[in-house]
Swiss-Prot record:
Topological type in the membrane: Peripheral membrane protein
GO molecular function, one term: DNA binding
UniProt keyword Cell inner membrane present: no
Subunit: Interacts with ParB. Interacts with FtsZ in vitro.
Gene Ontology BP term (one): positive regulation of chromosome segregation
Any one Gene Ontology cellular component term annotated for this protein: plasma membrane
One of the Pfam families matching this protein, by short name: HTH_24
Taxonomic source organism: Streptococcus pneumoniae (strain ATCC BAA-255 / R6)
Signal peptide: none
Protein name, entry field: Regulator of chromosome segregation
Keywords: Cell cycle, Cell division, Cell membrane, Chromosome partition, Cytoplasm, DNA-binding, Membrane
Free-text disruption phenotype from the record: Nucleoid defects. 15.7% of the cells are anucleate. Unaffected localization of the divisome. Chromosome-partitioning defects. Newly replicated chromosomes are not segregated (in 7% of the cells) or partially segregated and eventually truncated by the newly forming septum (in 21.8% of the cells). Segregation defects result in small cells, which constitute the majority of the anucleate cells (86.3%). No defects in chromosome replication. Chromosome-pinching takes place as nucleoid is asymmetrically distributed in elongated and constricting cells.
Lineage top rank: taxon: Bacteria
Domains (record comment): The N-terminal DNA-binding helix-turn-helix (HTH) domain and the C-terminal membrane-binding amphipathic helix (AH) are both required for the function in chromosome segregation and for its proper subcellular location.
Length: 163
C-alpha cells in the first residue's frame, strides 16, 4: 500500500500555500520524495509522516493507520537514517585507512633513505679511517727515509773528516 501525495494535495489538506509546502518538501531527504508518471514531485508515506510531525496535523485521514504501523514506519525511517550515518562513517574510515597506508609507505621510503644514508656515512668513516692510516704509514716511511738519509750523511761526513 503506497501512499503518495503531490505538493498541491498536501497544501489543500493542510490549508497552506503550495509554495510553503514545496519549500518544506525540498528540505526532505531524497528517499521521502519521488516523481510520478507525469513527472510531478510526490511525497512518499515516510515524507508525509515527517510533514505531519512538522505541522502537527494529520495529512491522510481517509486511511486509518494503526499505531503499530506508524511506529514501524518511524522505526524504518530511523533505521534508514542510521544506516546512512553508518555508511558515511564507513567511507570516512576507508579514507583514513588510505591515508594511513600512504603514511606507512612514506615511512618505509624514509626508513630506506635513512638506512642508505647510514650505509654511506659508515663507508665515509671507513674511507676516512683508511686515509688516516695511509697518511700515518706515509709519515712513518718519510721519517724513516729521513733518518736513513741523515745517518748516511753523517756516515759520509764522518768518514770524510776522519770520524
Amino acid at each position: 500500500m503506497s501512499i503518495e501525495m503531490t505538493v498541491s494535495e498536501i497544501a489543500e489538506v493542510l490549508g497552506l500555500s503550495r509554495q510553503a509546502i514545496n519549500n518544506r518538501v525540498k528540505e526532505l531527504p531524497e528517499e521521502d520524495t519521488d516523481k510520478n508518471d507525469k513527472g510531478v514531485t510526490v511525497v512518499t508515506r515516510s515524507g508525509l509522516i515527517k510533514l505531519e510531525e512538522i505541522y502537527k496535523k494529520t495529512i491522510f485521514e481517509d486511511e486509518p493507520v494503526s499505531e503499530d504501523v506508524k511506529q514501524r514506519e518511524l522505526m524504518e525511517i530511523l533505521v534508514d537514517e542510521k544506516n546512512a550515518e553508518i555508511l558515511r562513517l564507513y567511507e570516512q574510515l576507508k579514507a583514513k585507512d588510505r591515508q594511513l597506508s600512504e603514511k606507512d609507505e612514506q615511512m618505509r621510503i624514509k626508513d630506506r633513505q635513512i638506512a642508505e644514508k647510514d650505509k654511506q656515512l659508515d663507508q665515509q668513516q671507513q674511507l676516512t679511517l683508511q686515509a688516516m692510516k695511509d697518511q700515518e704509514n706515509l709519515k712513518l716511511e718519510l721519517d724513516q727515509a729521513k733518518e736513513e738519509v741523515q745517518s748516511t750523511k753523517k756516515g759520509f761526513f764522518a768518514r770524510l773528516f776522519g770520524g
